[in-house]
Amino acid sequence: MLITVLKSKIHNARVTVCNVDYEGSLSLDEELIKQANLRPYEKVLVANVTNGERFETYIIPAPANSREVGLNGAAARSAVVGDRVIVMAFAMKEPDEEVDTTVLIMDEENNIKEVKKLKA
């Protein structure tokens, strides 16, 4: 039996761009993608802390060190610039298998304030 566990989380990032007319979904600073142990085009769950909405989408890389957290296409209807969001990715594993979970805690300017390494 496989179970689904949290693999990566970016907590309290600020939305910097909303572009309904852009092809793509969640544009995320390439450096944040690496630090959070995510991959371009990986499926993610996004929770908008500001309005309570949740939606699934995928990651597209934004320029490294831009601190961009952009919602594009239909996802842009789910937030406004300045909203706080949580980005989560999951992995499937055997119950006795260990998964390294990475959690990035962000500050107001989308700089990494803290990195947590957990075992799932």
Swiss-Prot record:
Q: Where in the cell is it found?
A: Cytoplasm
What pathway does the UniProt record associate with this protein? Answer: Cofactor biosynthesis; (R)-pantothenate biosynthesis; beta-alanine from L-aspartate: step 1/1
From the UniProt record, list the coiled-coil ranges: none
Enzyme Commission number, as recorded: 4.1.1.11
Mind listing the UniProt keywords for this protein, alphabetically?
Autocatalytic cleavage, Cytoplasm, Decarboxylase, Lyase, Pantothenate biosynthesis, Pyruvate, Schiff base, Zymogen
Does the record carry Cytoplasm as a key word? Answer: yes
Tell me the cofactor note. Binds 1 pyruvoyl group covalently per subunit.
- Describe PTMs of this protein: Is synthesized initially as an inactive proenzyme, which is activated by self-cleavage at a specific serine bond to produce a beta-subunit with a hydroxyl group at its C-terminus and an alpha-subunit with a pyruvoyl group at its N-terminus.
Q: Does the keyword Metal-binding apply?
A: no
Alphabetized GO MF terms: aspartate 1-decarboxylase activity
A GO cellular component annotation in the UniProt record: cytosol
Where substrate binds, per the record, is at: T57, G73, A74, A75
Q: What is catalyzed by this enzyme?
A: L-aspartate + H(+) = beta-alanine + CO2
Q: Identify the HAMAP family for this entry.
A: PanD (MF_00446)
Q: How does it assemble?
A: Heterooctamer of four alpha and four beta subunits.
Q: What does this gene product do?
A: Catalyzes the pyruvoyl-dependent decarboxylation of aspartate to produce beta-alanine.
Which family does this protein fall into?
A: Belongs to the PanD family.
Protein name in UniProt: Aspartate 1-decarboxylase
Q: Which organism is it from?
A: Coprothermobacter proteolyticus (strain ATCC 35245 / DSM 5265 / OCM 4 / BT)
| Name of the coding gene | panD
